[in-house]
A protein has these predicted regions:
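Rossmann-like NAD(P)-binding element
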Residues: 48-100
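NAD(P)+-binding Rossmann beta1-loop-alpha1 motif at the extreme N-terminus of oxidoreductases
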Residues: 1-46
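Rossmann-fold NAD(P)-binding glycine/threonine-rich loop
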Residues: 92-142
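General beta-strand structural signal in soluble alpha/beta enzymes
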Residues: 53, 124-128, 177-179
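Short, conserved loop/helix-junction motifs that constitute active-site signature segments
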Residues: 80-85, 120-121, 144-146
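Active-site-lining helix/loop region of Rossmann-like oxidoreductase modules
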Residues: 147-245
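A glycine-biased structural micro-motif
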Residues: 3, 62, 85, 122-125
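Rossmann-fold NAD(P)-dependent oxidoreductase module
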Residues: 17, 21, 119, 168
């Protein structure tokens, strides 16, 4: 196992969910956020002896693999120097807002992960853990070979980095489906058949956008096989970039 320590930059729902699963799977985690290590004391105590708090730069340096779970709008604050030479998992999704839009994403000139890779030019970015929610991540893991093991998509430009992330996800309890390059990562982005719903099932009818988000965050999850992920990817047609609730 090449990954023994996971660096995590960002401790929102995704970062914390992945940290919990990683610790339970036997990995060490180094957590960081924009507010400082002292603000993570309770979380670290809850996670136990395999977890510690640090600054983003320290987490980047410590991780054999690094999860950059910050809002996409904050991706340019990721520590480039400390992440140089590292494989970086990108679970970020584009959520355009009146105060923050990216024309290159709106026009499909780039995917959000290509934007991240442009900032982290000396790192190996792999898109993963962006289409399954933290609740489902903590409920759907299974041992290798289990008939109901769930698969998640990944994309990246570096084959070795994709293999590294696939190994990590296997440790967490998931199979993977390689969808291609970062330019292909839109196949599993927001508003595609591969985003969220394969892992939650169909929501109740008549939900408002906010009710839908709350429902997704609480759904215990349903397994999605590698064959199902491939089937959905093959049928995906590109639509508008970013969340369109």
């Amino acid at each position: 196992m090449s990954t023994t320590t996971l660096g995590i930059i960002g401790t929102g729902m995704v970062g914390v969910g992945v940290a919990r699963r990683a610790v339970d799977a036997g990995l060490a985690v180094v957590l960081s956020n924009s507010r400082g290590p002292a603000t993570l004391a309770d979380l670290v105590a809850d996670l136990g002896e395999r977890a510690r708090a640090a600054t983003p730069a320290e987490a980047a340096e410590a991780g054999d693999l690094v999860l950059a779970s910050v809002p996409l709008a904050a991706h340019e604050r990721l520590p480039r120097a400390e992440l140089a030479g590292k494989t970086v998992i990108d679970p970020m999704n584009y959520a355009p807002k009146p105060e923050w839009r990216v024309p290159e994403l709106d026009d499909d000139e780039l995917t959000s992960s290509e934007l991240v890779q442009r900032h982290l030019a000396q790192s190996r970015v792999v898109k993963a853990l962006h289409s399954i929610g933290p609740k489902q991540l903590l409920n759907l893991f299974r041992p290798a070979g289990a008939p109901d093991r769930t698969a998640v998509p990944l994309s990246g430009d570096d084959p070795a980095a994709k293999s590294e992330v696939a190994e990590f996800l296997d440790i967490l309890g998931f199979d993977t489906v390689d969808l291609g390059s970062l330019a292909d990562s839109w196949l599993s982005g927001p508003n595609t058949p591969l985003y969220a719903l394969p892992y939650t099932g169909q929501p109740p009818a008549g939900l408002t956008p906010m009710e839908f988000v709350a429902w997704v965050q609480q759904s215990p999850g349903v397994p999605a096989s590698a064959a199902r992920v491939r089937e959905l990817a093959a049928a995906t047609v590109r639509g508008p970039a970013g969340f369109q609730l």
